[in-house]
Amino acid sequence: MTSASSMSVSVECVNICNLTKGDGNARSDCSALSCAWKAPRALTGFLASTAHPPVCSVYSCGRNGRKSRMKACAWQRYEYEVGFSEAPYFVNVRNILKSRLSCGGHKRWELYCVSAESSSGASSDVTVETLWEDLFPSISYLPRKELEFVQKGLKLAFEAHHGQKRRSGEPFIIHPVAVARILGELELDWESIVAGLLHDTVEDTNFITFEKIEEEFGATVRHIVEGETKVSKLGKLKCKTESETIQDVKADDLRQMFLAMTDEVRVIIVKLADRLHNMRTLCHMPPHKQSSIAGETLQVFAPLAKLLGMYSIKSELENLSFMYVSAEDYDRVTSRIANLYKEHEKELTEANRILVKKIEDDQFLDLVTVNTDVRSVCKETYSIYKAALKSKGSINDYNQIAQQLRIVVKPKPSVGVGPLCSPQQICYHVLGLVHEIWKPIPRTVKDYIATPKPNGYQSLHTTVIPFLYESMFRLEVQIRTEEMDLIAERGIAVYYNGKSLSTGLVGNAVPLGRNSRGKTGCLNNADFALRVGWLNAIREWQEEFVGNMSSREFVDTITRDLLGSRVFVFTPKGEIKNLPKGATVVDYAYLIHTEIGNKMVAAKVNGNLVSPTHVLENAEVVEIVTYNALSSKSAFQRHKQWLQHAKTRSARHKIMRFLREQAAQCAAEITQDQVNDFVADSDSDVEDLTEDSRKSLQWWEKILVNVKQFQSQDKSRDTTPAPQNGSVWAPKVNGKHNKAIKNSSSDEPEFLLPGDGIARILPANIPAYKEVLPGLDSWRDSKIATWHHLEGQSIEWLCVVSMDRKGIIAEVTTVLAAEGIALCSCVAEIDRGRGLAVMLFQIEANIESLVSVCAKVDLVLGVLGWSSGCSWPRSTENAQVLEC
């Protein structure tokens, strides 16, 4: 007797077999091979090898009025409950069975195990003919000529893998045929199916080369197979010859896979089918491999399936991975689902009956639809688990697991009902019927028809409380057309359909693009390009960050920025953009374009200026305000702050690169500042004034486009007040000596520039704003202050240029008051055409306090720049400009 702790047991989700012979008689075709490979074997935990022979049982089930048979292997001693003596818990398979069967889905859960002895005994029965008999029903939609290519590919794969075994002991050829079957169930074209058959031939054998595949089946098949296998083979060679870690090699493989799928989407579709079958047979791998593969599937492949809209594959990958990664949590969730369903089974049945009756009695639907199906659907186990984690409560306390009813309508052709009745209008009509019966819960109606998800998903969602039998439970109702339902399940795969036209899936019959062999490929379809637009981001990142990002960083960027939870926002033109949850307006700016992010000075959300730290929420309208004339140093300082607010790795990498570029442009100035700071911090006794940096400040044309250059006069440059008592005059900035000071004539056009943390001291009798700000000139000219040395010098005015937004004057004055700056008066003018505002404050302050306050004014939301100034006495003819 084999001990419980050494048994290899798994839970199997067996798809109900409804495969036909292909002879038109709709006879069921079920064999040990066809059902066994299709069945996902999901481990409940603690696998170990066993020599105990399985006992085969035959079950009968009905679907759509037809009976079919399926064959599986079950352990007699453990019919319902599987326990492990060394394990801290028991897996309750009874609840798993109950939850799956009660949901009315298309799957049944059974105990399943395959031993090496039984599979090796069956290997002699595997021939090309038996494999073709099992594969043909799933690809019978292909034309005869294309079926010949598939059969040719099967023979080639059979020869290449002859004599090879899987870990389970079964012939290796079963795996590629199973992958081809999965692709056939998605009704993909023959190139994809042949690539599925050959995807391991180059990697695992020396019999097949890429050149041979191209010669036999064309460049498209070679490209797909190459994307599947070539990189993995190189990765294996690296492991043997180099000192790289397994994680680095795996990251490099994933990076190459991501890049390959940007050129050919079918690379990832075949890869998903390959991973799905590997997950279904993962029970034969060692426990540490199971955990690693399942974790990678949850992190990379399931989110990729979601991005492609392939929800059927995504759901199965998540649930299978969940059972391997956390068997205890899986058991608790399934038990909770079963208990909740038992509590509300009566109400759900009654709600279904009421809704069906309402639809049957509606005359409009009878006129415009062929038929309407109402299905009872269970939420996926893993999605419920994530919702429970989000609520930060125990799964046993989580009661908001909404049961689902899915309404799928099949409209009549538009010729029969007229152009005024579109499929979308029928869906909205059904939504109205649902709300006539039950009132919707506020903020639960989601219209994915008007605003589809980026992967093409379309449906109407609403959540109601039926109030039946004095019981309250949430009932989610989904409404979609037959075409929408097909796209929701298969996603991007419908655009590689094996038929000549994609009929009705995107509105009308759309002739698809053609590949090298003249087969339909949909590469020129606008909807297709829209649904895989996120692939462009991967390609752009590779081009932008080549040499600056390791493979592990690149893969981490993709998994976090693309494959995580998303939020959907709108551009001002109504385009939908999706970003990772928690992204800020800084991330949005760099998502639109790198140059937009580099030139960003402010952002508006729903028409209101917001802080760069603003976290985006669903359905917000985001607008980025850019400015082309920011100085290098000002841009450097702003983006250095924004680096802290960027949440996506891609935005952070772009900002880092921008900072390096800006640092190179103003390297001399930055180096000089760093030297001066170091000397000041070291309490040096050197009191000599340092020479100013060589930076050439840009003319701020957009703000002062009409300011006239001043007439140059023959003035001496050495008009700085002489130091008193023979002392060396060296003003302090922020308490530090030896800051760079520039003494320049007033004829230099450098009197108003964006704030960069350096005070600019200007004479008041220069009409700087005469052309653009006439109201300020006379006000300022009447204010004359006196320049004093070191501790006694005074500042006369402060000019702040900002975006025109409500409350900005109050915020700036609050900052000034908080720093103890005395305000004598203030005027402001607005340029509504450009959305700019200029504020001019008459103040009393010294250099130390002014430099400190200007640095804080620069951080006020919407401030683009500032400039400060003073004046010499009127008796002084040689007006000078001092910058410190």
Swiss-Prot record:
Q: Where is this region: Disordered?
A: 711-747
Cite the entry's keywords alphabetically. Answer: ATP-binding, Chloroplast, GTP-binding, Kinase, Nucleotide-binding, Plastid, Stress response, Transferase, Transit peptide
Q: What induces it?
A: Circadian-regulation with a peak at dusk. Down-regulated by wounding and 12-oxo-phytodienoic acid (OPDA).
Transmembrane stretches in the record are: none
The record's section on InterPro entries has: ACT-like_dom_sf, Beta-grasp_dom_sf, HD/PDEase_dom, HD_domain, NT_sf, RelA_SpoT, TGS, TGS-like
Enzyme nomenclature, EC number:
2.7.6.5
Compositional bias of kind Polar residues: 711-727
Q: Which GO terms describe its molecular function?
A: ATP binding; GTP binding; GTP diphosphokinase activity; guanosine-3',5'-bis(diphosphate) 3'-diphosphatase activity; kinase activity
**Domain ACT span(s) in chain numbering:** 797-868
Any GO CC annotation of this UniProt entry: chloroplast
Q: Which GO terms describe its biological process?
A: guanosine tetraphosphate metabolic process; leaf senescence; photosynthesis; response to wounding
| Annotated ranges, domain HD | 172-279
Catalyses: GTP + ATP = guanosine 3'-diphosphate 5'-triphosphate + AMP
Q: Where does this polypeptide localize? A: Plastid, Chloroplast
Location (main, coarse): plastid
User: Which major enzyme category is it?
Assistant: transferase
Extra information:
In the ecotype Landsberg erecta, RSH1 (AC P0DKG8) has been shown to interact with RPP5 (AC O04264).
Task: Tell me the protein family, please.
Answer: Belongs to the RelA/SpoT family.
Q: How does it assemble?
A: Interacts with RPP4. Interacts with RPP5.
* Listed name of the protein: Putative GTP diphosphokinase RSH1, chloroplastic
What is the species listed in this Swiss-Prot or TrEMBL entry? Arabidopsis thaliana (Mouse-ear cress)
What taxonomic lineage is listed for the species of origin? Eukaryota, Viridiplantae, Streptophyta, Embryophyta, Tracheophyta
